[in-house]
Regions:
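PEST-like low-complexity, intrinsically disordered acidic/proline/serine-rich tracts
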Residues: 1-206
Length: 206
């Protein structure tokens, strides 16, 4: 599948808390070209991995009665959704994609994601460990595009946002000859760049 459009929670004027607004403001003061996290293979995780508009990087969905697995070419990432409605285990460690469980509401797959890892360093995407994400997936038939998956998002994160925020994505079926390949992106480059950028700022202030 490939993405046809996406609207991320951070678009427009996000309802940031004062603490999150400070982190966002620090990032916005940097060079938007040189300080783009994607240049440093920053793995954003959920919900942004599902909201990417990188049309040249396809994804694959594998579905069984008990699981839905999604494999993304972009950054070689994947996520697993357990279709059992059970909450995340208490001993689960936070991760960039969190722990996702789902139930069916007629023809709509309702996914709840918790156990998300903190992202409170400078970047366009901020998230705390208190974040909870709800997705609603629905397959529709478009006269021109064919099979589409429409996805509505809502993220609740009291550390980052003052109210729930929403996003939307539409995936369309890729051509039969499209293959999900490897991206091969080095890790930890962005965090090193953040440290270097902060050091430059401190040196310039002296």
């Amino acid at each position: 599948m490939s993405s046809s459009q996406g609207r991320s929670p951070e678009q427009g004027q996000p309802p940031y808390t004062p603490e999150a607004a400070k982190v966002a403001a620090e990032f916005k003061s940097w060079d938007p070209k040189k300080d783009d996290p994607s240049l440093y293979c920053d793995l954003k995780g959920m919900p942004w991995m599902m909201l990417s508009r990188a049309r040249t990087y396809p994804a694959e969905i594998y579905q069984t009665a008990e699981r839905v697995d999604v494999f993304f070419e972009l950054f070689d990432t994947s996520r697993s959704i357990r279709v059992n409605g059970k909450p995340a285990p208490k001993n689960i460690s936070p991760s960039i994609n969190g722990y996702s469980t789902a139930t069916w509401d007629n023809d709509t797959l309702v996914i709840k994601t918790t156990a998300l890892a903190e992202r409170l360093y400078p970047s366009p995407q901020l998230r705390s460990e208190k974040a909870e994400l709800t997705e609603r997936w629905k397959m529709v038939k478009d006269p021109k595009e064919g099979d589409l998956i429409e996805i509505d998002f809502e993220i609740v994160d009291p550390v980052v946002y003052t109210r729930p925020v929403k996003g939307k994505q539409v995936f369309k079926r890729a051509a039969p000859d499209v293959v999900v390949a490897s991206y091969n992106c080095p890790e930890k480059l962005w965090l090193k760049h953040v440290d270097d950028r902060r050091a430059q700022g401190k040196a310039a202030a002296k």
